[in-house]
């Protein structure tokens, strides 16, 4: 079986969805920009030699519809002979895109693929066109379709206080801002054209979603966003709405070596698991455990974790049940997470994997695990190993 390696991993800056940097930039353009950039950074690979393009996107309608992956590849002027498909596993879409490409390579059906994902939450709102089947209420709680309420339920089940949530959210912004100031994101962010507050076209090379002024004291004044009476989850402890894309060049190890390309990481194992939709945010726990089992590892073997911060109330129970509460500052989301950077739904799986690989290189780590929850009760995880 072929070994799967990540040759390169990049992303756009994360733009605010409400009047942000990419308010006049389409999702296909963000995607095409990264496709072109990956190929430009790796000229040893002939674009015509790509076997497929797997691109995650959740809301596949409006500008994100009609197979966005193919539209973006055509905009990027990738040869017409290279196919492309848009993948949807809700929040896990771009990590699923990685898994799909990895399996193709493992079985010998492909040697080189572009993978990634995008979500323009400013142009295609999260609730656009959503209409759940009424019959689902027979076996799934209505609140299962309301992500904030699932986070509330999870926090109550696991004893996660408002104070714990506020502290974690403040940490996310502080870590992300420190990473920005130190240049830690420089190797993963590709400068991307957008418009500033005055409408002037400029190149953005930083995440505009981060709020460096965030404090626990300020967060403590916010009202609950989803359960106004007894709730603890606020807008400040939820992932920010943002627009962005992320991409990876994935190859068989043999093809990468043949082309003289240096692999940055190897895909050690992959897993997807279902869980109760009412506590959908718990999905990373069983998914991570299964991925670790497949890799022949335990949580203690993992040097660094990237866990998508859908909500502080969601990620803290996962950290707790993976036995990592005492290692947050040493191992988990060292450059902040989605609370600070935002969670462009179809982009986030590739984004956290990209950030993880860069962190692994910076910290000289051997093993890393990226994982995320998925709406309606799923979790997805990938174990990476430095080559």
Swiss-Prot record:
It is found in: Cytoplasm. It is an enzyme of class 2 (transferase). It catalyses: an acyl-CoA + acetyl-CoA = a 3-oxoacyl-CoA + CoA. This is 3-ketoacyl-CoA thiolase. The keyword Membrane does not apply. It comes from Enterobacter cloacae. SUPFAM superfamilies: Thiolase-like. GO terms for cellular component: cytoplasm. Keywords: Acyltransferase, Cytoplasm, Fatty acid metabolism, Lipid degradation, Lipid metabolism, Transferase. Pfam families: Thiolase_C, Thiolase_N. GO terms for biological process: fatty acid beta-oxidation; phenylacetate catabolic process. Coiled coil: none annotated. Its main location: cytoplasm. Catalyzes the final step of fatty acid oxidation in which acetyl-CoA is released and the CoA ester of a fatty acid two carbons shorter is formed. Belongs to the thiolase-like superfamily. Thiolase family.
């Amino acid at each position: 079986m072929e070994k799967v390696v990540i040759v390169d991993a990049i992303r756009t800056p994360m733009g605010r969805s409400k009047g942000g940097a990419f308010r006049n930039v389409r999702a296909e353009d963000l995607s095409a920009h990264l496709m072109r950039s990956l190929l430009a950074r790796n000229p040893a690979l002939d674009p015509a030699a790509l076997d497929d393009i797997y691109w995650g996107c959740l809301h596949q309608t409006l500008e994100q519809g009609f197979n966005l992956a193919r539209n973006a590849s055509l905009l990027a002027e990738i040869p017409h002979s290279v196919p492309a498909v848009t993948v949807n596993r809700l929040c896990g879409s771009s990590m699923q895109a990685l898994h799909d490409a990895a399996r193709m390579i493992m079985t010998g059906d492909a040697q080189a693929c572009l993978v990634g994902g995008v979500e323009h939450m400013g142009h295609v709102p999260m609730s656009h066109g959503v209409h759940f089947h009424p019959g689902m209420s027979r076996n799934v709680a209505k609140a299962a379709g309301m992500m904030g309420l699932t986070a509330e339920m999870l926090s109550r089940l696991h004893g996660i206080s408002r104070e714990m949530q506020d502290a974690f959210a403040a940490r996310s912004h502080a870590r992300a801002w420190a990473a920005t100031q130190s240049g830690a994101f420089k190797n993963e962010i590709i400068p991307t054209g957008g418009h500033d507050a005055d409408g002037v076209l400029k190149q953005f090379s930083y995440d505009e979603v981060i709020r460096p002024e965030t404090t626990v004291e300020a967060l403590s004044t916010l009202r609950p966003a989803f359960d106004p009476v007894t709730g603890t989850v606020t807008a400040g402890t939820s992932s920010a709405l943002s627009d962005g894309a992320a991409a990876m060049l994935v190859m068989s190890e043999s093809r990468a070596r043949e082309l003289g390309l240096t692999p940055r990481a190897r895909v050690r194992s992959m897993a997807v698991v279902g869980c109760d939709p009412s506590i959908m945010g718990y999905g990373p726990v069983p998914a991570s455990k299964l991925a670790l089992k497949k890799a022949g590892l335990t949580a203690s073997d993992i040097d660094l974790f990237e866990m998508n911060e859908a909500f502080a109330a969601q990620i803290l129970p996962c950290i707790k049940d993976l036995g990592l509460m005492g290692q947050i500052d040493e191992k988990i989301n060292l450059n902040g997470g989605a609370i600070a950077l935002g969670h462009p739904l179809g982009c986030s799986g590739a984004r956290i994997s990209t950030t993880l690989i860069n962190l692994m290189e910076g910290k000289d780590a051997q093993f890393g695990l990226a994982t995320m929850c998925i709406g309606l009760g799923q979790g997805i995880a990938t174990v990476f190993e430095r080559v």
